[in-house]
Amino acid sequence: MAEAYGSFSEVYDTFMDNVPYREWAGYIEEKLRQQGIEEGLVLDLGCGTGSMTEELADAGYDMIGVDSSPEMLEQAFEKKETSGHDILYLLQDMREFELYGTVRAVVSCCDSLNYILEPEELLRVFRLVNNYLDPGGMFLFDFSTEEKYRQIGEDTIADSREEGSFIWDNFYDPEEKINQYDLTFFLREDSGLYRKYEETHMQRAYSAEEIKTLLQEAGMEFLQAFDSYSEEPPGTESQRIVILAREQGKSKKME
């Protein structure tokens, strides 16, 4: 699995302020309600700084958040203190996460599952999800497609805000289907000086068919795929796909 966010977590929300969390949360809520899930426990897998977790808590769900980055969870805890939501955050690797019981739904947003670099490990994640879902529970998640990584290619992205600046150097290997991005960022300190940090992250491109096969192998029922957070089916130009799957038994062995 790729490296978890470290120092960049301090400004993650600042530089990712273009992500429409509220809109996506409304979409997720509607899909869950269509399946009869209007309340109860919901797991946000790869919750990051807790932005989506907070939105779903606002919608009335009892939220659990799992993430492998202590720095990202620190930001999530700060949001929790502000909102007053009773959210349980767990510092765990999604490949080995453990819960105290089952949940009505699991969600995973913002490419979190693309950080799983091997299909065998993604299968293990799916089996864990299936294991911790209530009977008939729902799994809704998104992932970035190979088309997205091809479009980004070897681009360099730069941005600057009051809190700091960052440079994002991207490299995509179409043979290995691995996308690597090197983050160089400068965070402003209390003294007014800037400190330099560097992080490297990797994600894997999966096709919708690969995802469907792994879900079924994990024991889940594949229901639908959507072009991003819309009602349209995915196509060859889709850069983000949303998947809806359902628990249908615990017959598959955990490995």
Roles of regions detected by a PLM:
Residues 1-38:
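Conserved class I S-adenosyl-L-methionine
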Residues 43, 50-96:
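Class I SAM-dependent methyltransferase SAM/SAH-binding core
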Residues 123-135:
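A short glycine-rich, Lys/Arg-flanked "PGG" loop and its adjoining helix->strand segment in the class I
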